[in-house]
Amino acid sequence: MENIIYVGVQVQDFHQIVPKSGNVITFKEPIMHEVDSRWGWAIHKYPHYEEVGIEDVTFVGHATDDFQHHRNWAHDGAYKPIKMTRLTNSWMRRVNFVSISEANSITSSANVSAYDIKIDGNRGHAAIRSQGSSRVFIGKVTDRTNGPLIDNRGVIQQGAGQY
């Protein structure tokens, strides 16, 4: 929170540079934000892995049947089987998750897709999320997890989905 108060919103937009000639560069993809020099835009190297694929696998955790948001670390994050970080041109498809806290986090990545995902078992904290990334596609995610309702913890909902 301090960063946003003292520095302001931080925007990162990941791009591939095609040709470079002197002080002129060309991006392979369109720019997603207006570039205004008063905001101090800068170009940085971006160390990353490319063309990483995760497919045709099932991850099984041990999320409990009485999930409570922010109860403790076990409820919010004990069963996060995979995180896609600093990846480009990468994908996840035909993957199943059972009783997990969070299926997948896509962070600091570009041109990543996650699709044809199934989430079952006990409810957890999150399904699939993207944070600080550019051009991420998340689609065809079926979440049928079971767990207590947010506003009535005494009622267990079949197929409630992640929190």
Identify the function of each model-found stretch.
Residues 1-163:
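Extracellular/periplasmic carbohydrate-active domains that bind, remodel
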